[in-house]
């Protein structure tokens, strides 16, 4: 903002003001925060700002209070308090006193001395200060640098404050942030600012310690801490009555500026830059000069311990604070100051904040005397502690005592709440009172955060590595332990060893973030956080190293039993320095006490930090520890290998599970297949004897060949052709033929539609396994055909069994006897069939009409549905096709044993021709009776021979001659007749059975009674007379007719034709 240059004051109150150079315009309370008012100020108040250039006139602007003694030229000028001024009157009217505004910082709430942003013109321009009705004689031309009493007095007051704070040289440095230090810093900034307002200082003071670099650094730091100083300045206004400012005035002006915040114009920015540089020069010089003086007089400050985890300013990066730049400049004046800037400033911050009200009222000599006394007391205390330690342990004992004393001093300053909150009392003396004795110091030392770790000499590297040192401050060549310890020691016994090699690597330890642009790292960084050093005056590196060594060796007795062992991260320093007695050990051991003292000086983090917020963030950003503490680090290769192994294991497990599942499935499948196979074998290959031992009177008809397409009911004219498959002798057990067993096998057509396969016996040898239709007749009476059909009857097999015969034969009957009976029955049956044919032919010949009556339907039947009765195969090759179960079906075959059948030669069977209903063969008077008694007594008119020729052979003799042997072989077992009258031969009887539903079309064999086995009455064996035997009764063989089937038996007959053997 444009301001007025101090010029020649107007001679009268109403004179028009003369405009001054706008580059040198001063920012006033009307111009800083309110650009609109700046124009008014420029237009109206300019003439009031011009004053004669008299060097003595500046004295009128100095502080009315503390002292009127001239100060050294490097002292900062006083700032006029707001209470010394009166309210401004209307323009054109003079007011009693000038009023100095706080400048732009007042708007921000920072009225304390900061980086000198209030107004000292640079570049030869006169100082333009904001005022209200200022007397003209107060201001004079400021064309040349002046060293007025106001500046000296201001500087003297500031030095008094600093000396009262034991010469702290790190009030603006990296000391622990605390409310006291903040207040003190705010007050010092305010003092410095007002001093700069009072007088325009020289652009570049000639005193030592000043430099453009320091001014620039100071300005940057002031800007960085500008946000912090806003609230602090307000607090300092109330807490520093020495300044005699009216807080309301400051706040009102601040409010005025805050109400209309606008961006500063370029001219104002340039002016602010100049003023900042000038004010920074003054403030920096005052601070540095006081710092150097205090340190030169008082020596090293005591240690303020702090916890690493709670102290943001412990990190090496935090050393880059407001005090770093000044610390480097002060190092030029005092080598001790270069080494001990941070902790000293921290200590002075805490004390000055508590003592600021009374510091300004004292003269500089008194302040210096007080500071000298305090430092002397501290020096004596430290010396006594060192001597006591040396007396106890010699070279090794020196370290523990020194460490205890340092611990005592640091704790007296920081551990004590009173000392920490207010340092108006001598903290060193208080520390001396509290911890004057070595034992007491030891007891205090035991509960220090680093005492437990120091006692752990077995793990030196853990303590170093566990330090929360910032990796950003670690150079590659410097180990973590060395960097962490050296960067984090608040005050070290090596403070005086600026020439030691540790100083070099301490500078290396300082990360780029911890080094200011223009500050020499070797001077600033070696001991960045050593606020106090018990050995600050020790020029000998070896002596400092001895102190460090002894610090490193506290011994187990220093640990408090009640103390909880601090984790490695909390162990600031350990016995690593003691174990490394060599030069390298020194280098590393030196850092140990520093870290220990760093833990010993817990800088309060609750209050504002000394570092600017931005800088603190920058320095705290790289703070995260290395990942070593988080657990064992794994390389990407190891992780990939681990994942590969896991994937392979999963794949293997999946493959194993799949293979196991496959094996289980295969095993189950095999088991199921085996079960199914066994079931099939049980069903298909059941070992069921065709001829049972207990019932040897079974006759089995095994189908050899049949018309598979013509399986119809027996009542149909197209009944399937029935053929003899084989006739065997011997008993069949299971799937094999037992020697001497008897089976009569022929093709059957069952009346029922169910088809049964012959299980296991292989069926007929000709390979044609025709299905069989079962037809049963209710006229069978005692025949148990259905039982066998439902239980054991295989397909293509018909078993006729007379239960009585079975019971009679049983196991008591000899097999040979049964065979004979079967043979006899077969012979009788054959004879009967032949006799019936002969009789039929004879009757046919005798009666032409009767013959015609009988022949025509027979021929039609043969032509329409030819049937053949195959010749029985040779008995030399007996093979039963299918097994059957006993005791179910069976006509009343005789008991004749089929054993003799083997010797019989089969011949083509000449089956008789059956006639349909209505056709009757005149065989004799008993035909009708036989027919009425047993409908199975199917008779044929005459044997017709082979029906496949389509004609009936009328040569009965020839037919009889050819058919005797087969019928003998086909005679059923002896005594196989049932209770009912059954006198037909087996073949004709079987044809008759075909019509009976109970028998299931048992038209293949006619049952025979036991008396038909060569023993009974010839009447029971109508064919006996044919074979030259016993009582042939032709009247017992009726021809099939309507009258021959009184029981509703189906009247369709099958014509058997003898076929040649197929074996």
UniProtKB/Swiss-Prot annotation:
Biased composition (Polar residues): 163-181
Biased amino acid composition, Basic and acidic residues: 146-160, 219-233, 431-442, 472-484
Coiled coil: 816-851
InterPro entries tied to this protein: CEP350/CC187
Residue ranges, compositional bias (Low complexity): 111-124, 508-517
Keyword Disulfide bond carried by entry: no
A GO term for molecular function: microtubule binding
Keyword annotations: Coiled coil
Entries under PANTHER family matching the protein: CENTROSOME-ASSOCIATED PROTEIN 350, COILED-COIL DOMAIN-CONTAINING PROTEIN 187
Protein name per its UniProtKB record: Coiled-coil domain-containing protein 187
Natural source organism: Homo sapiens
Taxonomic classification: Eukaryota, Metazoa, Chordata, Craniata, Vertebrata
Gene coding for it: CCDC187
């Amino acid at each position: 903002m444009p301001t007025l240059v101090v010029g020649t004051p107007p001679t009268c109150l109403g004179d028009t003001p003369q405009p001054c150079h706008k580059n040198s315009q001063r920012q006033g309370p009307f111009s800083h925060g309110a650009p609109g008012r700046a124009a008014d100020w420029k237009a109206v108040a300019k003439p009031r700002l011009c004053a004669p250039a008299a060097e003595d006139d500046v004295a009128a602007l100095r502080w009315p209070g503390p002292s009127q003694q001239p100060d050294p030229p490097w002292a900062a000028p006083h700032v006029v308090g707001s209470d010394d001024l009166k309210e401004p009157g209307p323009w054109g009217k003079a007011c009693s006193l000038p009023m100095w505004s706080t400048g732009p910082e007042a708007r921000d709430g920072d009225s304390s001395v900061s980086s000198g942003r209030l107004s000292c013109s640079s570049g030869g321009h006169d100082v333009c200060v904001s005022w209200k009705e200022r007397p003209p004689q107060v201001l004079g031309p400021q064309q040349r640098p002046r060293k007025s009493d106001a500046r000296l007095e201001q500087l003297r007051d500031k030095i008094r404050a600093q000396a009262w704070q034991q010469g702290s040289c790190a009030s603006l440095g990296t000391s622990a942030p605390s409310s006291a230090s903040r207040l003190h810093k705010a007050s010092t900034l305010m003092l410095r600012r007002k001093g700069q307002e009072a007088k325009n200082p020289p652009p570049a003071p000639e005193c030592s310690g000043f430099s453009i670099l320091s001014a620039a650094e100071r300005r940057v730091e002031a800007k960085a801490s500008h946000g912090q100083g806003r609230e602090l300045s307000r607090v300092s206004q109330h807490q520093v009555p020495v300044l005699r400012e009216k807080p309301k005035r400051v706040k009102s002006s601040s409010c005025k500026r805050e109400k209309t915040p606008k961006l500063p114009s370029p001219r104002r920015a340039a002016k602010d830059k100049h003023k900042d540089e000038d004010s920074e020069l003054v403030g920096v010089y005052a601070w540095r000069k006081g710092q150097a003086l205090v340190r030169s007089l008082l020596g090293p400050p005591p240690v303020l311990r702090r916890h690493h985890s709670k102290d943001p300013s412990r990190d090496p990066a935090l050393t880059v604070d407001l005090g770093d730049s000044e610390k480097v400049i002060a190092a030029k004046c005092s080598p001790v100051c270069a080494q001990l800037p941070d902790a000293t400033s921290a200590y002075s911050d805490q004390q000055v904040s508590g003592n600021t009200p009374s510091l300004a009222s004292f003269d500089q000599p008194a302040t210096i005397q007080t500071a000298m006394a305090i430092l002397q007391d501290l020096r004596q205390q430290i010396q006594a502690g060192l001597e006591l330690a040396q007396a106890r342990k010699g070279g090794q004992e020196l370290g523990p005592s020194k460490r205890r004393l340092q611990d005592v001093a640091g704790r007296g300053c920081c551990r004590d709440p009173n000392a920490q909150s207010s340092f108006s009392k001598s903290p060193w003396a208080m520390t001396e009172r509290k911890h004057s004795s070595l034992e007491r110091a030891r007891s205090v030392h035991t509960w220090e955060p680093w005492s437990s770790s120091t006692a752990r000499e077995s793990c030196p590297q853990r303590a170093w590595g566990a330090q929360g040192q910032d990796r950003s401050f670690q150079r590659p060549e410097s180990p973590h332990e060395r960097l962490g310890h050296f960067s984090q020691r608040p005050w070290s016994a090596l403070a005086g060893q600026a020439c030691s090699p540790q100083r070099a690597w301490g500078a290396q330890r300082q990360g780029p973030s911890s080094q200011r642009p223009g500050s020499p790292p070797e001077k600033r960084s070696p001991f960045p956080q050593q606020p106090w050093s018990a050995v600050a005056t020790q020029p000998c590196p070896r002596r400092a190293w001895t102190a460090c060594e002894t610090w490193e060796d506290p011994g187990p007795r220093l640990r408090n039993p009640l103390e909880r062992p601090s984790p490695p991260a909390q162990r600031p320093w350990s016995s690593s320095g003691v174990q490394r007695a060599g030069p390298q050990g020194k280098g590393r051991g030196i850092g140990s006490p520093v870290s220990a003292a760093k833990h010993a000086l817990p800088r309060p983090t609750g209050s504002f930090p000394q570092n600017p917020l931005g800088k603190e963030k920058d320095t705290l950003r790289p703070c995260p520890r290395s990942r070593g503490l988080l657990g064992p680090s794994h390389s990407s290769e190891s992780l990939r290998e681990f994942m590969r192994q896991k994937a392979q294991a999963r794949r293997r497990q999946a493959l194993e599970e799949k293979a196991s599942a496959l094996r289980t499935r295969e095993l189950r499948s095999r088991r199921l297949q085996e079960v199914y196979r066994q079931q099939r074998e049980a069903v298909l290959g059941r070992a069921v004897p065709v001829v049972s031992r207990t019932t040897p009177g079974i006759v089995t008809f095994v189908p050899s060949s049949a018309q598979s397409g013509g399986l119809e009911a027996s009542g149909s004219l197209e009944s399937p052709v029935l053929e003899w498959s084989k006739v065997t002798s011997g008993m069949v057990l299971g799937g094999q033929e037992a020697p001497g067993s008897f089976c009569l096998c022929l093709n059957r057509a069952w009346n029922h539609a169910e088809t049964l396969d012959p299980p296991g016996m292989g069926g007929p040898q000709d390979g044609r396994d025709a299905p069989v239709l079962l037809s049963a007749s209710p006229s069978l009476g005692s025949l148990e055909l259905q039982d066998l059909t439902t239980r054991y009857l295989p397909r293509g097999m018909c078993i006729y069994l007379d239960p009585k015969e079975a019971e009679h034969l049983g196991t008591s009957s000899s097999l040979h006897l049964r065979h004979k009976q079967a043979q006899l029955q077969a012979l009788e049956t054959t004879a009967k069939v032949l006799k019936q044919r002969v009789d039929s032919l004879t009757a046919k010949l005798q009666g032409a009409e009767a013959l015609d009556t009988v022949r025509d339907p027979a021929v039609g039947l043969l032509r329409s549905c030819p049937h053949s009765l195959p010749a029985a195969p040779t008995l030399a090759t007996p093979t039963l096709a299918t097994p059957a179960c006993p005791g179910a079906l069976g006509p009343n075959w005789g008991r004749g044993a089929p054993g003799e059948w083997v010797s019989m030669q089969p011949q083509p069977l000449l089956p008789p021709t059956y006639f349909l209903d209505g056709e009757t063969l005149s065989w004799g008077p008993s035909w009708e009776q036989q027919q009425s008694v047993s409908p199975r007594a199917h008779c044929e008119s005459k044997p017709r021979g082979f029906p496949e020729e389509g004609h009936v052979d009328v040569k009965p003799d020839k037919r009889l001659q050819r058919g005797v042997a087969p019928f003998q072989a086909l005679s059923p077992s002896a005594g196989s007749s049932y209770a009912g009258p059954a006198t037909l031969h087996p073949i004709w009887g079987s044809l008759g059975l075909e019509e009976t539903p109970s028998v299931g079309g048992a038209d293949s064999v006619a049952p025979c009674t036991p008396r038909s086995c060569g023993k009974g009455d010839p009447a029971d064996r109508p064919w006996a007379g044919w074979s030259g035997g016993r009582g042939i009764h032709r009247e017992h063989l009726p021809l099939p007719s309507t009258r021959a089937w009184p029981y509703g038996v189906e009247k369709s007959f099958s014509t058997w034709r003898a076929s040649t053997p197929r074996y």
